[in-house]
Amino acid sequence: MKFRHLLGATVIGLAAPAYAAPGDPVRVSDDLTIDPIVEGRLRYEGVDQPAVDADALTLRLRAGAEIKMHSLSILAEAEGTLGLVNRYNAFPFAAASDQRRPQYGTVPDPMNVDLNRIQLQYRFRHSTFTLGRQRINLDDQRWVGSVAWRQNEQTFDAVRGEAKIGPVTLDGTYAIGQRTIFGIDAGPRQSYQGAFFFAVAGVKAGPANLKGFAYLIDYDEGFFAANSSKTFGLRATAAIPFAAAWKLSLAGSYARQSDYGSNPFDYAADYIAAEAGVGFKGLTASAGYERLGSNNGRALQTPMATLHKFNGWADMFLTTPAAGLQDYYGGLAYKFDGVKLLPGLNAAVTYHRFDSAIGDASYGNEWNASAGFKLGPVGVLAKYARYEASSFGVDTQKFWLEANFTY
């Protein structure tokens, strides 16, 4: 791989990170506290493809505070990303910015400064109401998420209500803005406007959780209108202990998506997902299947999701191909116990096979591997992805090494 001397330099930088002591809220009076927000993440990302490569070393910082009085709180948080090594293309689309560098591979972590969150929140008994620019992660983030993997977080200008009534949970959001990961230099793709409604209702019954959801997304921007859709579905999860130190985990989802609002196309496509895992002490083995369907030449899309979490870390399927996508995957993960020099040590490996949902095209396959541990208050993570193309995309290798801290 062509990660050259930068990998060595990054390892040296991550081996001696700046330490930060854990912070507690500052009590101003009996009723008033101020909780500071200080976060940092230094990351190297390398991309190796047949025609282009990339080397990116970026530093993301967040600073802010949450002021609480009784049931009311106000939170403000700024976020900035600095490109220390800029041999990468920050935008996978045309943009009037010198951060658009098509001679390099894409690493969508542009240099950026913005107001990440500013919100007013009220808590009353078992209910919470939040107004303003906020982080929203719904369920497994397949439909709506904050894209926490990227340096610039995705947030929403919205009003949200949450309630818990015995075993029942209710969650409703109305948003008018989707603040993307691309930042201030991305032109109209910095933020998408529209009318977005999210509703999730769940019930817990023994070891099982059942949720129903509805996502109605209507974009104002004409160039993005094809992503307007309505999605209705169900998701069930269960964690079942059996024998000594053994646990069975199950998850399944079904949804139906169709055109909505400003979308000029007519389609209706299904979503299916199923996963099973068996855990014994620190070891977990899992296998799963996910299908994003297609109809009338239009595939099911999830433009608000935390997409890096799904369908391989090489990010080859951020946009679902027109013929849909099937992902067959299996993996192993292990959490090491009692390693004093590397507390929290964990490792994982996953294999994916990708096919079309319509027809019999074989897109390719992918291996993912990761390892992480703690150095005092600093978390260290290494990740690797290798995609081998058959009929979709190109052979791609990616490597990440990062250190992060939260005060």
Role assignments for model-derived ranges:
Residues 2-4, 12, 18-136, 159-165, ...:
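Beta-barrel outer-membrane channel/assembly domains of diderm bacteria
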Residues 45-54, 144-151, 257-268:
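Outer-membrane beta-barrel proteins
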Residues 48, 73-75, 86-88, 141, ...:
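Short acidic, gly/pro-rich beta-turn/loop elements at beta-sheet edges
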Residues 56-58, 113, 154-155, 194, ...:
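Membrane-spanning beta-strands of outer-membrane beta-barrel proteins
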Residues 88-117, 126-225, 230, 234, ...:
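Surface-exposed coil loops of outer-membrane beta-barrel proteins
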Residues 174, 289, 384:
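Short secondary-structure boundary segments
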Residues 207, 234-354:
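Detector for outer-membrane/organellar transmembrane beta-barrel domains
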